[in-house]
Amino acid sequence: NWRDIFQNWEALAHAYPSFIEGMIFRFLNASTFDGYNPYRVTKDGFDWEIIEAHDPWSYIGYWGDHQIIYLLKFLEFIQKHYPGKLKDSLTENHFVYAHVPYIIKSYQDIVKDPKDTIVFDEELHNQIDRQKEDLGADGALLKTPKGDVYHVNMLEKLLATVLAKMSNFVP
């Protein structure tokens, strides 16, 4: 899970500071177009939770709040050890979006029940699984209408995260 990743990666970054840029890229590339993170990052990409009929404890949901703190710590670390290292990444399209089969409900629905905010899209889940069989981990990345992996810059990735928190705030 994300906490374990951060605790391990933070120690690794202190031992091997040159790894930090790759860690930041991996972290950001696991976020979705709507600014959230799936369940966990793995060596094969990332996973998301699904509802399992036989498991009453199964649950779906995005992760996001504590990942923002972890990302901030990584950004502070790279700035301390390699000042300006990520400057070009702000404008160069080196990043991708995770494609997770969750649909965020409308604001009106979220206000009605702020504890039930997403819908699992089983058809999209199956489509992504088929793409993963054909393309490997890239099958779970957001694509353009032509089927190419959609690339963005770091500024967009960071703004998506900020906007997700601001626009999905329920008073």
Residue positions per predicted region:
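Acidic, mature catalytic/reactive cores of soluble proteins
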Residues: N1-P171
